[in-house]
Amino acid sequence: MGKGSEDLVKKESLNSTPVNSDTFPAWAKDVAECEEHFVVSREKGLSSDEVLKRHQIYGLNELEKPEGTSIFKLILEQFNDTLVRILLAAAVISFVLAFFDGDEGGEMGITAFVEPLVIFLILIVNAIVGIWQETNAEKALEALKEIQSQQATVMRDGTKVSSLPAKELVPGDIVELRVGDKVPADMRVVALISSTLRVEQGSLTGESEAVSKTTKHVDENADIQGKKCMVFAGTTVVNGNCICLVTDTGMNTEIGRVHSQIQEAAQHEEDTPLKKKLNEFGEVLTMIIGLICALVWLINVKYFLSWEYVDGWPRNFKFSFEKCTYYFEIAVALAVAAIPEGLPAVITTCLALGTRKMAQKNALVRKLPSVETLGCTTVICSDKTGTLTTNQMAVSKLVAMGSRIGTLRSFNVEGTSFDPRDGKIEDWPMGRMDANLQMIAKIAAICNDANVEQSDQQFVSRGMPTEAALKVLVEKMGFPEGLNEASSDGDVLRCCRLWSELEQRIATLEFDRDRKSMGVMVDSSSGNKLLLVKGAVENVLERSTHIQLLDGSKRELDQYSRDLILQSLRDMSLSALRCLGFAYSDVPSDFATYDGSEDHPAHQQLLNPSNYSSIESNLIFVGFVGLRDPPRKEVRQAIADCRTAGIRVMVITGDNKSTAEAICREIGVFEADEDISSRSLTGIEFMDVQDQKNHLRQTGGLLFSRAEPKHKQEIVRLLKEDGEVVAMTGDGVNDAPALKLADIGVAMGISGTEVAKEASDMVLADDNFSTIVAAVGEGRSIYNNMKAFIRYMISSNIGEVASIFLTAALGIPEGMIPVQLLWVNLVTDGPPATALGFNPPDKDIMKKPPRRSDDSLITAWILFRYMVIGLYVGVATVGVFIIWYTHSSFMGIDLSQDGHSLVSYSQLAHWGQCSSWEGFKVSPFTAGSQTFSFDSNPCDYFQQGKIKASTLSLSVLVAIEMFNSLNALSEDGSLVTMPPWVNPWLLLAMAVSFGLHFVILYVPFLAQVFGIVPLSLNEWLLVLAVSLPVILIDEVLKFVGRCTSGYRYSPRTLSTKQKEE
């Protein structure tokens, strides 16, 4: 090994880090300097010994796999939630108390264990779902590996090694790339084998066209798109062959940096706005539960702890462990009542229903919380290529020669895809093409190596998209003499095939970057041999001496015609059209008898590309076309809808500035005549802006062109720091880090890479930007419905807490046991709450500005309303309990038919002193087929005997909550204007909940488990009489709400318009 090689190894060993583009800018050095730096020659490549040494330094050429989170840690993370911790504590305490449960607890046998077991089951299911989601979260990194090349052709020890595993490449390796190859590492182009080399790197950079590569070095500060002498791992060679030198491998490649950025973004994922609100609610709930439990405990201390005062000091303490345990159980019941156990399940169900609705609109949600987050999206950062545009090149204008010198004809071409049936040519002489138009069609069809195929109802290009667009144009032009009507089932390119049959192609003059044109020689059916040329308009025009007029006649190309063509070209370029010119001539005399044979003397001229310019001279110019990556038809209206909905649209693309600006003006991001100098920046220009956040706060649209992955990620990060809720769309590898970092990552389903899809929260099945806007509307509707059922469930829980608190405060026996409350929270409340998710959306839902992510889920007014409703629930449930014990009738309803004994309210409130009452006796009473008697212990009337009163309390609670679900149909709208049948699912859900309640009432085994008994008709009338007033109360509150809405919302509206600095 030479001294230079020894120095290199020594240097690398000292640094112990790979040489990468940060330490050696290979793109800014000439080929000789690169070979010298990596101590290699392109003729011999690296030696086997050198490869082994570099493997030890650089490792394998593959992306790192991050260490997965252990299953134990994943399980623990599922309990990192306030509500879950409260539930877990309640379950543990309930389980312990079940062992000490006695007669005073009111529960028997299995009933005592139902509550903790059900809570544990809820927690287990919740943990399983959470772990499943976590283990599926990092597939983006695996998908990234799939786009890496598997094999490479390498020069080692002076010998060409085919199919070497790409992971064995090291910096300094000499690699040969051929058309169709996937680039295995970041490499410096050191020699071109073909006359030209083009690489499709749009998935990495966002460019809409394949990029020509060269061996010439570029500026050291060039961005990815500007590194014309570099090819990058994961991109594809679409034209030409070359020799390259590996400069970076594995995690040091551009795709490796994307991998690192995805990992970094995954570590900074934040909770959704709803999750944050629920966590805040859980923390507040914890404090409230703690305070109320402590208060209940203090209120009832007198029942299990008493003392006498002797000489002013407390003496002779008496403590009852059974009663202490009993009141502790009441405190636990209070906790169970306060926690909306069914809320997580109902939220998940509502979000799942939302995903189904969105799927019907072609928005496939991968992560459930994204459904709700969409509703508060304030900024949509959209990629241009493939998202706002079709990513399918299409001809939009055709310019042909006129009937005389100095005249041009212009035709607008419709269509935005590779489907030949998509659009037509305006004012086109179908079947009556003149000679000039026929020649344009002939050149576009034959001087062309692309193909268009139909696959799964989609038309896709094979080869260069620009050439595929030309073939689609030929199909729209039709064929002369009525042959365009000829049937050819399944032939997508019918006209192109017919032209190819008439004009047999015998030689190809490949495109190169010097002359910027491609030519073909054809043996025409007319007996002549022609040279057909297409290329950059200026270059083709420069080599032309004549023009062809409408009737096919030739005229000398004068200066006026030349200037006219160039002016038309400039006008089209201002519209960001890429223009291609067409010309033809008779073949040079040397090729007059050429038939494509290698033995022909003229064939030698075709082997040397330097001859092509002279062959393609003295041309006859026939016309030119303007192509572009056209915007999607629906995008302009979708952006207008975003503006109406208060959502800002920012376009972030890797494409060049002029093209991006033209598209943005066309789709409505900018007005046609708007000054956008302060709104349109390149990625590098934005990074140099001093106050970046202030730039991003500008109202209206913004554009960032030539943006690299790091720029996209930085823009998303800054927007999130500024309090925006960001939806980021994209389809390429370059979009993946920003998709992962954004609040909502939206990937394209058709054109999107697997990397982008796996990094996203939502996939658009139709690749349509307007689908995002529809999904935002659906997200807002879902959020409104979620507010309805969250408030409904919380008001129910407030009612349960009020019921238990009043019971404890009044000193009467416990009205409802924990297992009954658990049943109500989980089962009875579930169907109505879920059905509220089907509430129809407001008609003006997309005409309102987005809610702020920190907007309160429950305002002070809403809390007051539900405190009032909750207090009524508590009064009603406790009241019906007292009524059964103390009244033989209520509002004309006879309650004495079961034969139960009446007691005074004072006796009920001091039931713990029953054993000291003289002559206290009670009669037996019936409940269904059961008879309850208390001859042996009359005081059991307040424990075992409370079963009927407890059933009435539970039934009133269920009935009130069913009627209260009707109140939740609208926040302030009366049931008169929004009747129950606007949501038939709610009526069905109420029937289901009542049905479930009847099941536990009238099925003996279940009635025993829940500690309840059947009710008579009169008792049901009492339940309804006590329950129905909840509708009237809430109607009054809604009326007050409507009357004061202006006062309550005007300050809020002003505050939302003020951005926090």
UniProtKB/Swiss-Prot annotation:
Keyword Translocase: yes
Entry's EC annotation: 7.2.2.10
Membrane topology reported for the UniProt record: Multi-pass membrane protein
Enzyme class: translocase
Annotated positions binding Ca(2+) 2: 336-337, 339, 341, 825, 829
Residues noted as binding Ca(2+) 1 in the record, renumbered to the chain: 797, 800, 828-829, 961
BP term (GO), one: calcium ion transport
Active site: 383 (4-aspartylphosphate intermediate)
Function: This magnesium-dependent enzyme catalyzes the hydrolysis of ATP coupled with the translocation of calcium from the cytosol to the endoplasmic reticulum lumen. Also regulates manganese ion homeostasis by pumping it into endomembrane compartments. Can also transport zinc.
Full protein name: Calcium-transporting ATPase 1, endoplasmic reticulum-type
Gene that this polypeptide is encoded by: ECA1
